[in-house]
Amino acid sequence: MSPQTETKASVGFKAGVKDYKLTYYTPEYETKDTDILAAFRVSPQPGVPPEEAGAAVAAESSTGTWTTVWTDGLTSLDRYKGRCYHIEPVAGEDSQWICYVAYPLDLFEEGSVTNMFTSIVGNVFGFKALRALRLEDLRIPPAYTKTFQGPPHGIQVERDKLNKYGRPLLGCTIKPKLGLSAKNYGRACYECLRGGLDFTKDDENVNSQPFMRWRDRFVFCAEAIYKAQAETGEIKGHYLNATAGTCEEMIKRAVFARELGVPIVMHDYITGGFTANTSLAHYCRDNGLLLHIHRAMHAVIDRQKNHGMHFRVLAKALRMSGGDHIHAGTVVGKLEGEREMTLGFVDLLRDDFIEKDRARGIFFTQDWVSMPGVIPVASGGIHVWHMPALTEIFGDDSVLQFGGGTLGHPWGNAPGAAANRVALEACVQARNEGRDLAREGNEIIRAACKWSPELAAACEVWKAIKFEFEPVDTIDK
């Protein structure tokens, strides 16, 4: 290379490696209303300052890379870079910090949860300078929210479709989840629906296996729905799982469900993927189907406190991608979930405007600008003795789903469903009369047993069943 060429190449560009914090740590930055804001729990490697760690997260999840590149001069880094604008220590932890990062809106494709996550959590979580990294929360600005359709229908439209008001909805996951023939599966659905439930449900891993192909299941479940509706005079539904190996097959299953005239289908949104989920949500809105969402695989991502992504982020992403129901834990059942934290993301699913509230794990004020809400589903290890607590915790706009708590009734599925319906009606009536469900719950259930032998039998079976384990993921005190 001639000296002349060498001189020209070096003008305005100095090769080498420089600290991330020189470019991406900007504590003086004032966030914009259009920025996507992220709160990361950062655990740096020994010797890495929190400012450098936070700046590295901002850089590697936006415009930065490990070395200076000459093409930086071909764009405006100041316009497009992510910025770590605030750092605070985590209470009770010596080597963890909450690092706040602001991302310009131009970094993200409109209406794409897939692209948003690919940027914010796609690559940086494997960064060697960090021992662990967790995305605790996101603030989605109205300017980005309005590029999404959101839930196919929302809470009010669902209630109008079902003609059911003033109480939580009741559901049941059919068990055993695998191994039943389509006809026996449909029979189990029918017994639950005629007994008083609003919905029955495919479990997350019921797709189209050799023992029960999807088309056969759809037909027998539709028959169960129509027969139960004729007997009870109520609108019934079964969450027909449309999750499949390809998007094309998934849509084909949803089309068949619509042709059968059933009210609702289902999708496993994490294993199925956000692109598939958004496609299905659009189809459901266009064709009048409600969409139930299962969160299978979520705990792989959100269970550990110092690494991964909190479920409140997955819940926000689902509301944007689209779903009318989503499983949200129970607080009192067999699955992980602290009460205040669970109520925090339940509000993020249902409400239009949610204030920042660190006591409930909410790091940012979130304005959904009239995007429809999602109904939280409480499911997993719950039974009739839990009904007062569930009614008090989740309120009317929820689905309370009893799988074993229905099918495990000693007299069969229909009596199990009747027991749950009587318990729910008793709790709702007591609440409406001003009684304290948290304090008087057991008394309310015992009183209802006098009028319902099905409930009395259920109470006897599950009187000693408890799941008393401390949650792994808790709010920082």
Swiss-Prot record:
Q: Tell me which residues bear N6,N6,N6-trimethyllysine.
A: 14
The superkingdom of the source organism is Eukaryota
Give the record's cofactor note, including how many are bound.
Binds 1 Mg(2+) ion per subunit.
Indicate the annotated site residue(s) for Transition state stabilizer.
334
Q: Which GO terms describe its molecular function?
A: magnesium ion binding; monooxygenase activity; ribulose-bisphosphate carboxylase activity
- Per UniProt, which keywords does this protein have? Acetylation, Calvin cycle, Carbon dioxide fixation, Chloroplast, Disulfide bond, Lyase, Magnesium, Metal-binding, Methylation, Monooxygenase, Oxidoreductase, Photorespiration, Photosynthesis, Plastid
Question: What residues does substrate bind to?
Answer: 123, 173, 177, 295, 327, 379
Recorded hits in InterPro entries, A to Z, give: RuBisCO, RuBisCo_large_chain_AS, RuBisCO_lsu_C, RuBisCO_lsu_C_sf, RuBisCO_lsu_fd_N, RuBisCO_lsu_N_sf, RuBisCO_lsuI
Q: Which residues cross the membrane?
A: none
Instruction: Provide the E.C. number(s) assigned to this enzyme.
Output: 4.1.1.39
Cofactor(s), by name: Mg(2+)
Which family does the entry's similarity section mention? Answer: Belongs to the RuBisCO large chain family. Type I subfamily.
Subunit note:
Heterohexadecamer of 8 large chains and 8 small chains; disulfide-linked. The disulfide link is formed within the large subunit homodimers.
Record function comment: RuBisCO catalyzes two reactions: the carboxylation of D-ribulose 1,5-bisphosphate, the primary event in carbon dioxide fixation, as well as the oxidative fragmentation of the pentose substrate in the photorespiration process. Both reactions occur simultaneously and in competition at the same active site.
Name assigned to this protein: Ribulose bisphosphate carboxylase large chain
Q: Name the species this protein comes from.
A: Agrostis stolonifera
The lineage, from the top, is: Eukaryota, Viridiplantae, Streptophyta, Embryophyta, Tracheophyta
Gene name linked to the record? rbcL
